[in-house]
């Protein structure tokens, strides 16, 4: 009887712990948005940036950064 409970515990515990860590990766869109937000914040801290919005895909003349949204470099 003890062996049965031990096997049951091990199987349930391993499925919940390993399943939660292996089957649930970080969603890529959320990770991509976080990286883009970090890039926007870096542009805002740059001394080339001004508080204006630029069209998507416009390159900054002085710095090789593609403006997507938020502060734009001029």
Swiss-Prot record:
Listed A to Z, the keywords are: Cleavage on pair of basic residues, Disulfide bond, Ion channel impairing toxin, Neurotoxin, Potassium channel impairing toxin, Secreted, Signal, Toxin, Voltage-gated potassium channel impairing toxin
Tissue specificity here reads:
Expressed by the venom gland.
**What does the entry's PTM section describe?**
Contains 3 disulfide bonds.
Q: Which residues form the propeptide?
A: 20-41
Domain of life the protein comes from: Eukaryota
Q: Where in the cell is it found?
A: Secreted
Q: Can you supply one Gene Ontology CC term for this chain's record? A: extracellular region
Record's signal peptide: 1-19
Which Gene Ontology molecular function entries are recorded, alphabetically? Answer: potassium channel regulator activity; toxin activity
Q: Which family does it belong to?
A: Belongs to the scoloptoxin-07 family.
Could you tell me what this protein does?
Inhibits voltage-gated potassium channels.
Q: This chain belongs to which protein, by name?
A: Kappa-scoloptoxin(07)-Ssm2e
């Amino acid at each position: 009887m003890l062996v049965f409970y031990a096997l049951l515990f091990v199987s349930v515990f391993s499925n919940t712990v390993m399943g939660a860590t292996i089957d649930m990766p970080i969603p890529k869109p959320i990770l991509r948005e976080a990286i883009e937000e970090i890039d926007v914040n870096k542009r805002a801290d740059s001394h080339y940036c001004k508080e204006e919005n630029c069209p998507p895909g416009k390159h900054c003349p002085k710095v090789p950064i593609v403006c997507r949204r938020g502060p734009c470099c001029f």
